[in-house]
Amino acid sequence: MTTIHSRQMLQEHVSMEFSSSTTHVQTFSQTTKIVGEEVVRRKSSSIVEFFSLVTRSSNIPAGDSVPEFVEKPQPVTAPEGDKAVFRARVQGNAKPHISWKRESGIPIKESAKIFYDSINKEHVLKLEPLTSDDSDNYKCIASNDHADAIYTVSLLVTEGQEKMDFKKMLKKRAPPAPKKKQKKVANEKEMLEILSKVPKKDFEKVCMEYGFTDFRGLLRKLKEMKKKVEVEAIRILKPLEDKETKVDTTVVFDCIMELKDPNVKMIWIKGTEPLRIQYSLGKYDVKQMGTKYMLVISNVNMNDAGIYSLSVGDKRMSAELTVLDEPLKFLGEMKPVKVTERQTAVFEIRLSKKEPNFVWKFNGKELKRDDKYEITVSEDGLTHTLKIKDARLSDSGEFSAEAGNLVQKAQLTVDRIPIKFVSNLKNVRVKERSRACLECELTSKDVTLRWKKDGQLLMHGTKYSMNHEGKRAELIIEDAQLSDGGEYTVVAMQDGDPTEYYSTAIVTVEERLATVKSGMSDVHAATGSPAELCVVLNDEKVEGVWLKDGKEITDLPGMQIVKQGAVHKLIFPSMGPEHEGKYTFRAKGTESEASVFIADPPTIDPSVLEALAAHAITVKVGHTAHIKVPFRGKPLPKVTWYKDGMEVTEEERVSMERGEDQALLTISNCVREDSGLILLKLKNDHGSATATLHLSVLEPPGFASQPQVTDVTKEAVTITWNAPTQDGGAPVLGYIVERRKKGSNLWVPVNKDPIQGTKCTVDGLLEDTEYEFRVIAVNKAGPGQPSVPSSSVVAKDPVKPPGLVQDLHVSDSSNSSISLAWREPAEGDPPSGYILEMRAEDTKEWSKCTKIPISGTCYTVGGLIERQKYFFRIRAVNEAGVGEPVELDKGVRAMPPPGLTTT
């Protein structure tokens, strides 16, 4: 077990010590009070930080560690009644266990709270409320399998403010202290003993109290006395010794000392510089085992050579470290390497020491790390490895490792990858006169191929086709005969490889016998039309012959024999009576028979088709449509009627009949929806024919829009309207205009023949008579519904708007009214009234003086403000509109006569 302590006492100053463990500070302060002839220690307070590490094992597994304080507890000074909180964060592997204790051995009081703050990841000791009994040094102990880390801090509980105030009060009320007598000591030695027990700041005061005036002499002797004591406190039993070691080793400087003060300051030094041990990343480590003190230097290199010293108090020991430099050499030989193509070749060599100028070469050319070459060095820098990836034949050659002036060489041999058949030739069985195909796939495309049959080399020609694309190879045998059966072999070779690789398969050629896959059917063809007989065999290589009525066809008038693979045809370009009969197709092992007959497909006379296409069949709503189409054809064709693409079926209003020479479709009680495209389709086994026509079911048009009156005189009225939105299936031929007197139910036609266009002038009217008008649209189906009647209108000449009012003047005035007068306009039609308007002097807005026009030629405007100036204007009005305004020349003030005041 190893125990490492670190403590430092600061009385007059604070110093820092760097070591491999931690930095620790302990501060002490003392106050003394002199009473009578004795020096009495009345009050003592201290701030303490102390760390110790107790290890259980010197060998700690990789990945494990001793406990370490990431955040250390801090000393606390607090008054009575307050609280004290100590916090610590610890790390280590295995995970440390945390406990808290008092250094005095007294148990921590029950009211204390010890817990783990999971948010801040802190271990906490909380004491509340504080009493003087809580003053002590508190230990935070972090323990795991490897060590105990103990951090000790102080808690100083001071007196509360109330007690201090009470003491001051008592001090003020106490009687005056008696005059102190001068203290006496026997000699200077006794005085030095007294001074050694008091703080330096009180030295002069104590000397005066004891009657010593040589203060500086006493202080010098006191320092010499302390130095002597300190020197005797360090006893070196074994000094540091010189060391000699090799590179990459670990060396230990050690000495044995007896220290009366275990807290004496120690510093390890290299040359003249102190070692910063905690920042050395494990390079330096300081250990203590009892009285033995050690400096451990790891991974020694040439730069570590030099003088190492240990300073303890005022003593210093030194020793020299000599690092031996070994000669560079290869630890072993490079061995030749043999690999197969695409494998990775590896060369490896180990040196006796690190060499920065190490290179790999291939055939004398230096290699650099890239996708082809992977160059690595071991962690200790001694083993060098070269990997040649995806080795090829071109990589064969001499590889060398050069370290300084040393060279090692070795040969790399790359063998070809043996050829393998990914898929071998497979036995093939084919029919006579067909194509046979042998194929295989190899692992490489860079090969030379030869084909053999029964051991004989085959040559490329019309019989044999030899193809080689990539890794696939095939042999094709065209028009295979029975003699082409046998054993076939493909032989593969590659450059640099004398081995022949081969694959073999058997080809079997079977005699070809045909069967009918699709036989002939009887043919019915119209005179002059083309026809054909067709047989499909199961084998396109088989030939055959045609027979008519049992005799082979040799002379072919009007016939053609065609073979398309397995399809055999006998074609008749133009059927005639001579072609009727029984036909047979005969092939090796099979035959097929069929008969040929003359037949006429249905036809419709072209003139009928033209007439149906040119003229639609028209029928009025509610009437019956009869659609009759003549045709010719045998046997009688199937008759199908279609309307707008949909097949027509018989129902209550629809019936269909088929005669020997005509087809009839009857639609009764027609409606507008029956209009559309009618298609007749005739079909029998020999052909088909179609006829297309249009059925138009008409109804009278819809009503036109309400007529609008556009011009009126005492003798005539002009009206306009819009065409109906529904024309009833036929264009509107014109319009009938009707009129009636207002209040009468009798409508009188204005025109005999339909009017073209949508405008009409109705004349012959009675002056001052009120009329209404309506319009009726007409098409092939007749007149439609009448429109909504127009607005009523009186037959008279139009009225003109009145002209300008004459002689507008003021006839009288008062404080609240102004009277005006005028004469009728000289131009335009007579007015039905007048609009008089006014505005005050301070506004530009005109306002009417009356809600309705004034009927006379004078008017008094009341409700005016006294002496306010007003402006007036007047306009004549009748049923034709409002005339232009006439304004009074000047403003008028609301005030009484004498005289009309105008300004």
Swiss-Prot record:
For this protein, the record's SMART domains field holds: FN3 (SM00060), IG (SM00409), IGc2 (SM00408)
* Keywords from the UniProt entry: Immunoglobulin domain, Repeat
Q: Which Pfam families match?
A: fn3, I-set, THB
Domain (Fibronectin type-III) spans 703-798, 804-898
The protein depicted here goes by the name Immunoglobulin superfamily member 22
**Domain Ig-like, first and last residues per copy:** 67-158, 232-322, 418-508, 606-696
Q: Sorted alphabetically, which InterPro entries does this protein's record hold?
A: FN3_dom, FN3_sf, Ig-like_dom, Ig-like_dom_sf, Ig-like_fold, Ig_I-set, Ig_sub, Ig_sub2
Species, as recorded: Homo sapiens
Q: Give, from the UniProt record, the effect of changing R7W.
A: Found in a renal cell carcinoma sample; somatic mutation
Note the SS bond partners. Answer: none
